């Protein structure tokens, strides 16, 4: 009854298996893709009819990791998977970005792609497997889709590109780049790098695109065997007469409106033109569809902007193709934060802060393969006021998570190692104004805020967004694109890096035919823009501050004998708890005996270090210590010395005369000098008050109270 169709092929060092026809047969298409024991089950369901009045393409991509895939039970209270993690959201975006441009213009039927990780090999990341699965399932489904696509991860180890490196190999790699594309063209790139050159990055993109052809070939073969008939879908016929009428009413006016350089003023004028045009046309013919008129007007807008750029005319805001908008760079703008910066580029502005914390502030991530600790956090917030709108304010949306991750990639390469700078660092970027490339403004602001906070980053980094307008063989690459140029252009190309090289590259390409030469021009133009921005940033702050903020915790590190860790922690954590309360510091102890004391007050930190040194000091036989009585028993008293170690003063060692009752001579909490007589093999300490007193003042042995002497 079940008759699966299977294809196997070698992909780099891994074997990939595509299997369909076995499971989820009520879905439009379903594929199980495995790559060396990492298996992802991908389904596609498409609605045969579009919803009435639908004016956008409702594509949803869900990526979900099941902990059973790694042989684990979820660590949450309910012991089941909950809302998507940040990692799952990012991979869902990674799948969505290269497939979305391949659906035909005008196709508005609902399509849902669900990728479920069902088995995982710790060495093989499921993201590439899920992307291959989505491509295969869409190609098999019969839904209008101009695929398939291939996907590849590229590493750079020992000056060599490596296809689909394992997790262990990635630790040695200077590059982690994911590239996806069709047989003819690259569609998406997502990467982080350790400051590689433009040529090295471009080489990785080309290498990945060449290597993924084997994936496309095998999906095509699978479609020949198991593909469903292609849907008989046709785009709505173009109403040439209506298009001409709308153009006659609006094209010249829109062309004039797009010469207004101020964004808000321009948007207001464009809205007036659109509403007046639609009102005029509806007055002429009430049967016209308002949504259709809106789409025609949008197409005219797009054509106006693109044709002007291709003709070499100034851009929307009057700039030439390679000009950067005006920059305003300020640091130390918030008095009590550990580091802050306000970075403004034209009508895009980011208020960025850096906060320093201890290892205890690190984020513990419960991932598929277990827990992982992240000591560098980057959060990006995009409130509705940044574009002059009202809207919901709440948990971050997919876009905010994606932009935050891109900005983090841009800064990661220059962050100091934990052994040199043992702080957890959190950067928050608040986008206060937006008109294009707010994620790259976040990179610039983060670099400034980190230097303002005294974080010893290896170099300043800046980011820039590039755009492309292409018709036939004629193309123009635009530097520092506006929001409108992003929407109306053919490519969104973001590059972050230092003067020495690229730290992050993200590309989203909406058309086929972007050649290596075009990408080379864009990368070189982006380098010039990046260096210009870095020059302006360096005028505001050219190196990390020599000291961290007075409001930031200072971490002091000392080393103790690992055998003494238990003494510092105490029974059930009693000693370390008392220490933190007594000194007002945060104390963390590692297994190798490294102790980190964090405090905003230097004197408190010194006090904590002194107390820890007392606790861990070796007790010297024959030495006199100041002690405190902690317990009184019939046969003597226990006295704490040397940072809390208890020793016994036997009743015979309290005074140089016979003592009947210990409480006649000693009270709880009393401070007394004691001499160490012996430390036995089990670490038990024998003390004497009598000998300590004799050693310091021969005639000053403790005496019974006067009232008792008279009896």
Curated annotation (Swiss-Prot):
- Name the enzyme's class: transferase
Q: Which Pfam families match?
A: KH_1, PNPase, RNase_PH, RNase_PH_C, S1
> Where is composition skewed (Low complexity) in this entry?
694-711
* UniProt-listed GO biological process terms: mRNA catabolic process; RNA processing
Q: Which UniProt keywords apply?
A: Cytoplasm, Magnesium, Metal-binding, Nucleotidyltransferase, RNA-binding, Transferase
| Residue ranges occupied by any S1 motif domain in the UniProt entry | 622-690
Q: Which residues form a coiled coil?
A: none
Name listed for the protein in its UniProt record = Polyribonucleotide nucleotidyltransferase
